[in-house]
Structure formats: C-alpha cells, structure tokens
C-alpha cells in the first residue's frame, strides 16, 4: 500500500512538472532524462504531440547492479464527465499502437486539474530488444479504440462494450521517437552508476 501511494505521488508530481514546463527551450526531439531515488531509478520522458501534458515514460531501475529491463508506460489526460472513469483502473484497455491492435493496462487513475489522468502500462522488456524494436518507428502513436466483446469471451480484466469516447475526450496521441536511442543509452549509463551504499 505504501509503495502504491509513493508511486501515485511521484507520478502526480512528475506529470505536474511536465505540464508546467511548457516553455522549455529544449527542441521537440529532446528527451527528458531524470534521476530518482538517489539514482536507482531513471526516467526517460517525452511530451505528447496532441495533448502536450500526456507523457511517454520509459523507466530503468538498478537491481543488484544491473539495468537490463525497461518499463514502458504512457499517460492520457481526460476531461470526460463520466463518473465511472475511475473504474477502468486495473483493466486492460484496447488500443492501437502504430496500427497494431494491443491492450494497455490502466494501472492508475487519479484526479488531475479539471479531469483525470490515466497511467497505462505496456510491460517490461529487455533494453536491447526494446531498442531494436522501437527503432523501426519514427513515431509512437496510440489510439484508444472501441471493443465489443460477447459475454462468452469476457474476462474480469476487460470492460464489456468498451467505448473509448465514454472515457476519453481525446482518445489519441503520439510522441516523436527521434533521439530515443541516445536517451535510453544515457539513462542506462546513469542507472548503472547507482551504488547500493548510497541508501542506508
């Protein structure tokens, strides 16, 4: 419970910082590489092309001196008036990633400004394999899509007759991937510099 609360506040503060920083002098191809937890966790962040405050987030964590896994997630901001938006938390939501039909887990839903922010998790991957895959694309494009499932195929982690616009007023966003390799290499180098002795 404490870990979940910590993640909630860290992500909340992180997203607020990204939204406020709209006047950054950095070019659009620049990735924001940040250190957390005394350097044990490194974040690689990119703001969205459609909704600026939506963030593509790649996370590396030093585990026993190794930084071999990367966690992929992204956020969507919604101002829809649906009072049940919180109920998608923990559910797998249908999406299109660059025309591939997939699911993204709505890991967290929390109030933000005049609406809600939803953090989606896409899983963890081996860093080199992830880079090889992502370098095939120039853009990381996400569209939250509708899905009609019969009762026969329904699972507890899915939403029956899910309609994207019931939950998201802007159901799509994209992030430019230019410079992603350099950003991940930099993040992994920083991650490997972490020493367990830094935290008593």
State what each model feature region is.
Residues 1-4:
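Positively charged n-region of N-terminal signal peptides that target proteins for export
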Residues 19-21:
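N-terminal signal peptide c-region/cleavage motif recognized by signal peptidases
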Residues 23-200:
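A generic "folded-domain core" signal
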Residues 8-17:
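Bacterial N-terminal signal peptides
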